[in-house]
Amino acid sequence: MKGADPVFMRILIVRHAEPDYVHDSLTEKGRAEAALLGKRLSRIEASAYYVSPLGRAKETASYTLRLVGKNAVTLPWLAEFRGYTLDHQSGKKRIPWDYHTDEWVRHKQLLDRDDWTDDPLMLGGNVKQIWDETKDGMDVLLQKHGYRRQNGIYLCENNTDETIILFRHFGIGMAILAHLINVSPLPLWQGFLCVPSAVTTVVTQERRKGEVEFRCVSLGDASHLLQEKQNPSLAGLFPECYNGIDSTDPNKWPAHEEAQAILK
């Protein structure tokens, strides 16, 4: 006898489309990406939409929201992860990802889900404050949907099959995912990329009645672009080969006709 269809909540963590960082908006390519993303997400019955207050995320979300005829709730903490560290040599502010591997890999404390913010590499800035804000923000949001965090799991009286969609940025997205699956965000920040407009899917597992765990079933899925033979943007990725420009913004790289072929 065929079993009943599984019931699980889905959280779709969506990165904004290709950004124009100078104007906090989307590039022409980004608008095309957002339109294809909108077609994809409009086929999903979502119960709620949440969006970062930043322009590039709002513009990305607008393509989906117009198609479904709904509004999104703006959450200030969904803005790109605002935590920063202080460079031990220059004293200048740094974002807590995009470190060179040899700068962080020997810091084993950075892999500790509870104490990574106390590692010397993370001290001097406000990383712990923003990490706490991120965790609290996500837990408050989930509590509104019936899930209360306790000791790394979420308690719920009635697990549902609703879907919620978050339009956000790479750094904050990986921080959210890390919190949900109980790991430090450092290996996610340093070792993974979600290309612009990519969708990360997290679902619930209720292995004990009333106790829910989250599991990531898809990270950085850009199938809506590939199906339309659109190459994903490389924004967020450093150059494959050294070119003298240490930037994740492809618009700053020297022209290279092979660059966009990396993710075909």
Question: Which residues does each predicted region cover?
Answer:
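Phosphate-coordination/substrate-recognition cap region in phosphate-metabolizing enzymes
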Residues: 5, 39-118
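Acidic, low-complexity terminal tails and accessory targeting/binding regions
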Residues: 2-7, 81-95, 99, 153-163, ...
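Mobile, glycine- and charge-enriched loop segments
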Residues: 6-27
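Internal catalytic-core helix/loop-beta-alpha segment
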Residues: 120-153
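Active-site metal-binding loops of divalent metal-dependent hydrolases
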Residues: 17, 170, 220-222
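Short catalytic helix/loop segments, enriched in acidic residues and glycine
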Residues: 26-41
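Conserved beta-strand termini and adjacent loop/short-helix elements that scaffold enzyme active sites
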Residues: 14, 75-77, 217-219
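Beta-strand elements within well-structured catalytic alpha/beta cores of enzymes
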Residues: 10-14, 50, 161-168
